[in-house]
Amino acid sequence: MSNTGRIPLWLVGLVGGLAVITMLSLFLYGAYSGLGSSL
């Protein structure tokens, strides 16, 4: 942990994974709500 100037790889993976999960959940929620409202 000597390279404090760089962002840790696990932190990048964690943030990236959370962002992907959030975007996927929002996309699925929007698709389901759109289909429900259209039907």
Swiss-Prot record:
Pfam families according to UniProt: PsbJ
Which keywords accompany this UniProt record?
Chloroplast, Membrane, Photosynthesis, Photosystem II, Plastid, Reaction center, Thylakoid, Transmembrane, Transmembrane helix
Regarding the membrane, this protein is recorded as: Single-pass membrane protein
Which Gene3D superfamilies does this chain map to? 6.10.250.2070
Kindly list the residue ranges recorded as spanning the membrane. 7-27
Q: Which GO terms describe its cellular component?
A: chloroplast thylakoid membrane; photosystem II reaction center
Q: Which GO terms describe its biological process?
A: photosynthesis
HAMAP family associated with the record? PSII_PsbJ (MF_01305)
- PANTHER family in the cross-refs: PHOTOSYSTEM II REACTION CENTER PROTEIN J (PTHR34812:SF3)
Q: Tell me, how does this one assemble? A: PSII is composed of 1 copy each of membrane proteins PsbA, PsbB, PsbC, PsbD, PsbE, PsbF, PsbH, PsbI, PsbJ, PsbK, PsbL, PsbM, PsbT, PsbX, PsbY, PsbZ, Psb30/Ycf12, at least 3 peripheral proteins of the oxygen-evolving complex and a large number of cofactors. It forms dimeric complexes.
The family this protein is said to belong to: Belongs to the PsbJ family.
Entry function: One of the components of the core complex of photosystem II (PSII). PSII is a light-driven water:plastoquinone oxidoreductase that uses light energy to abstract electrons from H(2)O, generating O(2) and a proton gradient subsequently used for ATP formation. It consists of a core antenna complex that captures photons, and an electron transfer chain that converts photonic excitation into a charge separation.
The name on file for this protein is: Photosystem II reaction center protein J
What taxonomic classification does the UniProt entry list for its organism? Eukaryota, Sar, Stramenopiles, Ochrophyta, Bacillariophyta
Gene name, Swiss-Prot/TrEMBL:
psbJ
